């Protein structure tokens, strides 16, 4: 067995901890030993279906109580798991089926495992000639034990954001998971006997699948897991579960914490729940906005939320999950730098007066990872030099599976180009400024879309997290940009004119450049990934 599966199966046999699912209406708790026994039955069914070492299996299941034993069963069979993108009630199933079959063909899936609430997809998949297995049928099989699996066998094929159309899957090995899991254990100062993890993150995203399902299953950690739909129906369920189970650890993207802050102010009163047990509230998967963190701390103070609990972090599917964690108990650490020097000279010079930019530091690198910052000539930059972040280490993916075949992620020396622009502080802490492909270059200045979007989001009437800055004329000598925002008042001409004017005003005040145009759209118009990130490249048609 690999180190990953050996430790996971050992902890399943010895741990008294487990996983609570089904909140808020039908909570049920299974110990990791019970999850393992269910996995052995599913593994028996997989063996009968011909699934074995090296096979790839797609999974379309919505409930963590079924995803956990299914994932473990696939690893017992030496197979790898791909969580397929899930259709929503508004999804055109015919279009979804075509996109999904493209992914299934690319990964050469041996079968697809389907469970509630996606059983409606079974006839569609079978019509396409796919072998479909259900969790219910697999659970009825005779249990078997694990087969021998190597360190470099694939465990996960993580679909990247926006994978439909031109899909790409990040290949994650047993070695990758083991290395990143052990590093996160140290970085989070994890205590198996005391810590309780609470999560609503989706299992089709790396933070939900790896960080808040695979990792607790691997270490035998106590986990309370609900679905994204549960969170969307009642944002405060997140806080209620932390209170009920005395949760100590959670994680989410920046937008979710901003939404929680709003709900705490509008719908809760002190005494409704206690958040003082929370010691590790990781913010990742999208840029961490210091103002949003500070707003959450202000809204959460009456409920016992401690400033030291907030933990900005940096990660990506290509490193299995995590790259750096802020130091435990340090809280938000802001690096305030001269915005003009940052834009013009690509230097992050500390400043407290004049035109400054506040950036969240994302902590030191986790163990077994190295980072360097590279300039446009390929030279390594010193501390506070802004360039492309490159990474190297044992948790780093060997590469991607694409429609054209395998593409290695690492150069001949093992370095991976993240596509992120950022710098390292004198202490070696990571700071991310933006994505190379999204940066707008005007008159030799680097203008970051996140700055524009933050300014647009300050305008009254703009929906939170629903402003996107789009680069125009990319590749020409003179670039420009446009801004699209969503508003509930998109059909009111007077309100639209006001919002357009105020967005332009706020953007000029923030970055000293006027957008070519501002477009006000209805709710749900701006394209986002399944995990809620803005799809800037896909937004061009909205503003042109």
Curated annotation (Swiss-Prot):
Name recorded for this polypeptide: Putative ligase Rv1013
Species, as recorded: Mycobacterium tuberculosis (strain ATCC 25618 / H37Rv)
Name the EC number(s): 6.2.1.-
Q: How is it modified after translation?
A: Pupylated at Lys-528 by the prokaryotic ubiquitin-like protein Pup, which probably leads to its degradation by the proteasome.
Upper lineage is: Bacteria, Bacillati, Actinomycetota, Actinomycetes, Mycobacteriales
Select a single GO molecular function from the record's annotations and give it. Answer: ligase activity
Family assignment?
Answer: Belongs to the ATP-dependent AMP-binding enzyme family.
Which EC class is this protein assigned? ligase
The GO cellular component terms are:
peptidoglycan-based cell wall; plasma membrane
* Keyword Thylakoid attached: no
Query: What CDD domains is this protein classified in?
Result: FAAL
Q: Which PANTHER family match?
A: DISCO-INTERACTING PROTEIN 2 (PTHR22754:SF32), DISCO-INTERACTING PROTEIN 2 DIP2 -RELATED (PTHR22754)
Keywords linked to the UniProt accession? Isopeptide bond, Ligase, Ubl conjugation
One of the GO BP terms on file: fatty acid biosynthetic process
Q: Which InterPro entries match?
A: AMP-bd_C_sf, AMP-binding_CS, AMP-dep_synth/lig_dom, ANL_N_sf, FAAL/FAAC
- Position(s) of the covalent cross-link Isoglutamyl lysine isopeptide (Lys-Gln) (interchain with Q-Cter in protein Pup)? 528
Q: Is Transcription regulation among the key words of this record? A: no
């Amino acid at each position: 067995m690999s180190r990953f599966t050996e430790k996971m199966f050992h902890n399943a046999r010895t741990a008294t901890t487990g996983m609570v699912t089904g909140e808020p209406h039908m909570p049920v708790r299974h110990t990791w030993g019970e999850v393992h026994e269910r996995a052995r039955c599913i593994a028996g069914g997989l063996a009968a279906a011909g699934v074995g070492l090296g096979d790839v299996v797609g999974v379309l299941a919505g409930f963590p109580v079924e995803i956990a034993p299914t994932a473990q069963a696939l690893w017992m069979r030496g197979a790898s798991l791909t969580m397929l993108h899930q259709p929503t009630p508004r999804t055109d199933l015919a279009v979804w089926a075509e996109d999904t079959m493209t992914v299934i063909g690319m990964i050469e899936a041996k079968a697809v495992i389907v469970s509630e609430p996606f059983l409606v997809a079974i006839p569609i998949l079978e019509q396409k000639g796919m072998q479909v297995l259900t969790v219910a049928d697999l659970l009825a099989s005779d249990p078997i034990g694990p087969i021998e699996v190597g360190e470099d066998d694939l465990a996960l094929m993580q679909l990247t954001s926006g994978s439909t159309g031109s899909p790409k899957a990040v290949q994650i090995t047993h070695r990758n998971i083991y290395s990143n899991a052990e590093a996160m254990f140290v970085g989070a100062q994890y205590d198996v006997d005391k810590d309780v993890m609470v999560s609503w993150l989706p299992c089709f995203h790396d933070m939900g699948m790896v960080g808040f399902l695979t990792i607790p299953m691997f270490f035998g950690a106590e986990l309370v897991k609900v679905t994204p739909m549960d969170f969307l129906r009642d944002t405060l369920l997140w806080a209620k579960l932390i209170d009920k189970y005395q949760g100590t650890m959670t994680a989410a993207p920046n937008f979710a914490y901003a939404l929680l802050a709003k709900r705490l102010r509008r719908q809760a009163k002190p005494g409704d729940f206690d958040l003082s047990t929370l010691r590790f509230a990781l913010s990742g998967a999208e840029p961490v906005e210091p103002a949003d963190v500070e707003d959450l701390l202000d809204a959460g103070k009456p409920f016992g939320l401690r400033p030291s609990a907030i933990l900005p972090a940096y990660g990506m599917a290509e490193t299995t999950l995590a790259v750096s964690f802020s130091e435990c108990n340090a809280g938000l650490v802001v690096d305030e730098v001269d915005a003009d020097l940052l834009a013009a000279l690509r230097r992050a010079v500390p400043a407290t007066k004049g035109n400054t930019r506040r950036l969240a530091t994302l902590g030191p690198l986790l163990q077994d990872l190295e980072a360097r910052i590279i300039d446009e000539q390929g030279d390594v930059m010193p501390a506070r030099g802004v360039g492309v972040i490159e990474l190297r280490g044992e948790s780093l993916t060997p590469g991607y599976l694409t429609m054209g075949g395998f593409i290695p992620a690492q150069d001949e020396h093992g370095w991976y180009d993240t596509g992120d622009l950022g710098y390292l502080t004198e202490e070696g802490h990571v700071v991310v400024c933006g994505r190379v492909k999204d940066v707008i270059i005007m008159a030799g200045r680097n203008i970051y879309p996140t700055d524009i979007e933050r300014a647009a989001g300050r305008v009254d009437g703009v929906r939170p997290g629903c402003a996107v800055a789009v680069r125009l004329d990319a590749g020409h000598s003179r670039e420009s940009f446009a801004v699209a925002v969503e508003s509930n008042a998109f059909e009111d001409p007077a309100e639209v004119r006001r919002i357009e004017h105020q967005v332009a005003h706020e953007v000029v005040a923030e970055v000293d450049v006027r957008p070519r145009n501002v477009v006000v759209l209805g709710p749900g118009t701006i394209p986002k990934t399944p995990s809620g990130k803005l799809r800037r490249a896909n937004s061009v048609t909205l503003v042109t």
